[in-house]
Regions:
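Helical hinge/lid and interdomain linker segments adjacent to catalytic or ligand-binding clefts
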Residues: 37-43, 52-54, 58-155, 159-162
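Stable alpha-helical elements in mature extracytoplasmic
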Residues: 47, 65-69, 119, 139-143, ...
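An acidic, glycine-rich "communication" segment
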Residues: 47-48, 156-254, 317-350
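Active-site-proximal beta-strand elements of phosphoester/diester hydrolases
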Residues: 55, 241-243, 282-286
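Extracellular ligand-binding/catalytic regions of CAZymes and related secreted enzymes
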Residues: 28-46, 64-65, 72-76, 86-87, ...
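N-terminal secretory signal peptides that target proteins for export/translocation
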Residues: 1-9
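Residue-level preference for short coil/turn positions at secondary-structure junctions
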Residues: 46-47, 121-122, 149, 207, ...
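Bacterial N-terminal signal peptides
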Residues: 10-24
Length: 350
């Protein structure tokens, strides 16, 4: 007996887009929510991969820079991107929330919150800026699971002192902190805070590394961080890509500060997980929203994301790192009223 197909021509026509163009039906890996932002990837080498970006600090306007980076990575490079924010109890992005409890009112202190961290399980890479957070255990759990997944980790500026909370993470019976993962924690300002700026000088021996493809003229108005004691250097296994020379004043092209030696501001390393995998890690202590007006720094971060996700053959100096809108971030600092920083819904940062 033969099976006779009786589907009409009209029905077949209705199904053709699903057969010929299945990609248009692919959903973003993170559902829409008023608590975060999602950016579907366009065409590009990152098609089918998902980057989570986290903005969770109080000083450097990551609530503006991470959406800019996400939109650029989605539009010009094809990555699906999601931006998660530290929000207050009303669900507003609130950099003005205190880091430390008021003396005598410790019991009233509310932990910080980053909704959506469970979607790190669907991420192929993480780019984050965070500072001195106290997070609930269930949120720390999602972060630790990602840190121990073997997937790439890119930390910017204050990421190396992300948490006041102790991470529920141990290796060989010893507690792991974020500085162990990133290759050093903030110790002090090597440059003069809010007075010096930083010129990024590429390490000559590494100038041909793929992460530095097309990278030039790195400069930012933030100062250099010291992440290791004087007389020592980066921890074993870290490879410096860029040295930060403190400059007098906050204008690109300013004079070197003769009293300040250059220190590493960008390096990469491996992080060996409990399962024996090695995650690619890049730390840039440059990375304020104002720093990320610099196309050289943006390109370095994009290249690092490609490298970490196994797309090093797709790195090119011709790819676009232009922002997709009118990126004019507010100044860094804690004088929120003068700067114009107030709690806002995530949608304001799209």
């Amino acid at each position: 007996m033969k099976f006779i197909h009786t589907m009409s021509t009209k029905s077949l026509a209705a199904l053709m887009p699903l057969v010929l163009f299945p990609a248009v039906m692919a959903a973003h890996p993170v559902p829409a929510s008023p608590l975060w932002l999602t950016y579907p990837g366009g065409e590009g080498p990152g098609k089918g991969k998902h980057i989570v970006l986290i903005a969770a600090e109080q000083e450097y306007r990551s609530e503006q820079s991470m959406p800019m980076m996400a939109a650029m990575l989605a539009k010009h490079h094809g990555f699906d991107c999601s931006v998660l924010f530290a929000v207050n109890q009303e669900g507003l992005v609130d950099p003005t929330r205190p880091v430390y409890p008021e003396k005598g009112k410790e019991a009233e202190f509310k932990p910080h919150s980053i909704p959506g961290l469970e979607y790190l399980a669907k991420a192929d890479a993480l780019i984050f800026v965070a500072r001195l957070l106290t997070l609930p255990d269930d949120q720390l759990k999602h972060l630790v699971e990602y840190f121990d997944s073997g997937k790439p980790i890119i930390g910017l500026r204050t990421a190396n002192h992300s948490f006041r909370s102790v991470l529920p993470y141990q290796m060989d019976g010893k507690p792991v902190n974020i500085g162990d993962i990133l290759g050093g924690s903030f110790m002090n300002h090597h440059g003069n805070w809010q007075k010096d700026s930083t010129r990024g000088d590429i390490v000559t021996e590494l100038k041909d590394h793929p992460i530095l493809t097309g990278v030039k003229d790195i400069w930012g108005p933030t100062d250099v961080y010291r992440t290791f004691k004087e007389g020592t250097t980066l921890p074993e296994g870290c490879t410096a890509l860029v040295l930060g020379q403190p400059l007098i004043g906050r204008v690109q092209g300013g004079a070197d500060n003769p009293e300040k030696e250059p220190l590493p501001v960008v390096w990469f390393k491996g992080w060996k997980t409990s399962g024996g995998e090695t995650a690619f890690v890049l730390q840039s202590t440059m990375g304020s929203a104002k720093d990320l007006e610099n196309p050289g720094l943006r390109r370095l971060i994009v290249n690092a994301a490609y490298w970490g996700m196994g797309l090093k053959d797709k790195i090119t100096s011709e790819s676009s790192v232009d922002d997709t809108g009118d990126y004019k971030p507010l100044s860094s600092g804690f004088n929120y009223a003068n700067i114009g920083v107030v709690p806002r819904p995530p949608s304001d940062y799209r």
